[in-house]
Amino acid sequence: MEMLNIKEFTKEWKAGIKAQMDGVSARLAIVQIGDNEASNRYVKHKKADCIECGIIPEIWKFPESITQEKLEGELRDIILGRPSGIIIQLPLPDHLDKERLISLIPERMDVDGFKTNSQYDPCTPLGIKIYLEACGFPFEGSNVLVIGRSDIVGKPMARMCTDLNATVTLAHSKTKRLSDHIQNADLIICAVGKAGFLNCYPIHVPVVDVGINFKDGKLVGDCINTDNRMVTPVPGGVGLLTRCALMENTIRAAEYKNK
């Protein structure tokens, strides 16, 4: 297996999405609350991705002080405008109920794939799967270790790998003798969220690093300062795949809407 350059891979992926846009009109509504610096940056990137792919971005920005009731009303109005997809930029201020807001988004518009009955796969595991398939990873019969069992990364990632006939171990904070599972793995997908979590283990297989952590003022993953060239970079790795998968889900939503 060859680990493809993710920046080059996602550039080609977005070009492919744009090529599919012929005759398809797609709009992505991005709901942002407050003026969080990180959220501003992420929304800026997603807007640029939309434009690059031929998708119309619609940015709905509300003050941090907005009430739950007011925001729910605004969200209902956005839904009535019938965009192809809707996402809510996270994190939200503490006084807002994230789960309640996401529950209001129709399944056909849930392009983040956050709802349990969404029509789309969550973007991060979808992006990872498509990337690994392009790299030629032989899922069938391989031992895949997924570390982290969140509802939007670990669990759906394990399901996708199982659907591709891999033998999957879903590890978590209570897993005993993790080193044994690491030693037996043909591929590791780590979504723990602890800087350098994997550094204490000898690893000689491909690693997809989903971790987003800050250490000494720098963005790092769950595996840092490693000589293993088979580890995806942070930054410039899974985040790019996630954003491309969002564009992929959005065009799927547009095609569904136009049927």
Task: For each feature predicted by the language model, list its residue ranges.
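Anion-binding alpha/beta catalytic cores of soluble intermediary-metabolism enzymes, centered on
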Residues: G85-F139, G196-L198
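Short beta-strand elements in bilobed, periplasmic/extracellular small-molecule ligand-binding domains
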Residues: C50-E64, V168-A171
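Short, well-structured alpha-helical segments in soluble
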Residues: K70-G81
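Positively charged, low-complexity intrinsically disordered leader regions
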Residues: M1-S25
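Rossmann-fold NAD(P)-binding glycine/threonine-rich loop
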Residues: K98-D112, V208-K257
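Short beta-strand segments enriched in small/hydrophobic residues
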Residues: S25-D35
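Glycine-rich phosphate/diphosphate-binding loop of Rossmann-like nucleotide-binding domains
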Residues: A38-K47, P122-V210, K215-R229
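Short beta-strand segments
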Residues: Q32, I87-P91, I147
